[in-house]
Amino acid sequence: MLDHGTPIQPVSLPAAELDLGAVGGIAWPEPVQRRLRVGLLNNMPDSALVQTERQFRRLIGPGVELRLFSLDTVPRGPLARAHLDRFYETQGALAGAGLDALVVTGAEPKAERLADEPFFPALAAVVDWADASGVPTLFSCLAAHAAVLHLDGIERRPLPTKHSGIYACTAVAHHPLLAGMPASVPVPHSRWNDLPEQALTARGYRVLRRSEQVGVDLFVRERGASMVFLQGHPEYDGDTLAREYRRDIGRFLDGERDTPPALPENYYVDEAVLRLDAFAAVARAYRSPALHADFPTMAETLPRPAAWQEAAAGLFRNWLALVSDRVALAA
């Protein structure tokens, strides 16, 4: 059966209050300084809202106070709105929250131009606040695109085909964010747009990690407030790309998109690739919503082990160590 993604479920605690312990068997050290307070501005669509909370909670680790924030201009259904009303604060509360750092997630794009998205003005205001306040901020995927567009007028460019899969990303600079990490690490990417590396470096951004296949992965701003930008998704669970693929092929069957999606690259085990390729051929030939029932199950189409999670945890540990050092210097 086709899985359209995990809907929001009522929970007794938000991800901000869960202690998820280790990531991929990695034990988190005790905080070096006082307990940090980190904000998560979650702009993901309803179907991924709670999952995204948990993913970033896992990477931020225990011993950190996580505060949840949302933009009023991201469209929400009633169940998601109830969750936000219970566990989240609005964008207006950011300034008085006493944050040591902020993570800003991506969002599901709807408009052809990023500046035309209904949430763009509010997101731009958050970028301005982070820049003026000096709060270290990490921007993920679409949020990274929005930030550099607002700060420096760097337009993202549409890709001929979607970058979807696990890609080897190689360090191209020395930086504390990469301390203790291998020179090349796997990173999930899932995006229809790209930031040109030349445009970033011309405006003073420093690329730290890139891929021969998908371009810039990780970069930082060299002036002003501390800002980190990710085009990839190190926070992803092992099955996230699988769920995105199932969602997109479902949209093809339902006539919501013109072409079927390509399989995520370097992601599925060989047997799963054969099963999914066979189904995609049937879907192209006999496109119909009735084919939802014939889609191979998740158990029949296993992805490879989530080899990126150790490096993802290392990146966030290094980022939080830099935040902790900044807090100690300001004390």
UniProtKB/Swiss-Prot annotation:
Subcellular compartments: Cytoplasm
InterPro entries linked to this entry: Class_I_gatase-like (IPR029062), MetA_family (IPR033752)
Annotated substrate binding sites: K162, S190, R247
Residues at the catalytic site: C141, H233, E235
Site (Important for acyl-CoA specificity) residue list: E108, L142
A GO BP annotation: methionine biosynthetic process
Pfam families the record matches: HTS (PF04204)
UniProt pathway: Amino-acid biosynthesis; L-methionine biosynthesis via de novo pathway; O-succinyl-L-homoserine from L-homoserine: step 1/1
GO cellular component, one term: cytoplasm
Marked site (Important for substrate specificity) residue numbers: S190
Highest taxon listed in the record's lineage: Bacteria
UniProt keywords, alphabetically: Acyltransferase, Amino-acid biosynthesis, Cytoplasm, Methionine biosynthesis, Transferase
Gene3D superfamilies named in the record: 3.40.50.880
Enzyme Commission number: 2.3.1.46
Function statement: Transfers a succinyl group from succinyl-CoA to L-homoserine, forming succinyl-L-homoserine.
Family: Belongs to the MetA family.
Record's protein name: Homoserine O-succinyltransferase
